[in-house]
Amino acid sequence: PKSIRELSSLFENDCIFINRQRGSGTRLFLDFKLGELGVSGDQIRGYQNEEYTHWAVAASVSSGYADVGIGIKAAAVSNGLEFIPLGQEKYQLVVPESQMENNSGIPKLLALLDSSVLKNRIEQLGGYDVSMMGASMKIGDNIN
């Protein structure tokens, strides 16, 4: 309803924003992107309103408390909201090589992460690329 299509819509339209808490990855991402646009959070109505989870942000929007917030696709979909991607994040689990050999739990964890059952469940949430999930690599390998 507010014609929100991209990040600049947050300060160009009369919309109420719900933010993530200071220090969260989502908040750091937003602040970085705003800096690239030369915009301050003070220019966004509701920037000071904070929630602590992606689902709380989505609930704030679906309840009408806010018009827009930034979060993950799974939270948006589970609350019946439209999702507009702003970027992608990659995560790696880093384990010392000695633990790979001396800790039986690590290979079990990697086997679980590489299992088709878990990958399928995560894909069903929406918004996740599981193609490299469970893959083992050494630091310095290309992880793009």
Regions found by a protein language model. Name each.
Residues P1, C15, E89-L93:
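Small-molecule pocket liners
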Residues P1-R5, V39, S98-S104:
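Short helix-loop capping/hinge motifs at secondary-structure junctions, enriched
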Residues K2-S8, D14-I16, S116-N144:
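N-terminal hydrophobic or amphipathic helices and topogenic motifs
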Residues L7-L30:
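Short loop->beta-strand "edge-of-pocket" segments that line small-molecule binding or catalytic clefts
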Residues G41-T53:
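Short beta-strand-to-loop elements that line the ligand-binding cleft
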Residues A58-Q88:
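A ligand-binding cleft/hinge motif common to bilobed small-molecule-binding domains
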Residues L81-A111, V130-K138:
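Periplasmic-binding protein-like
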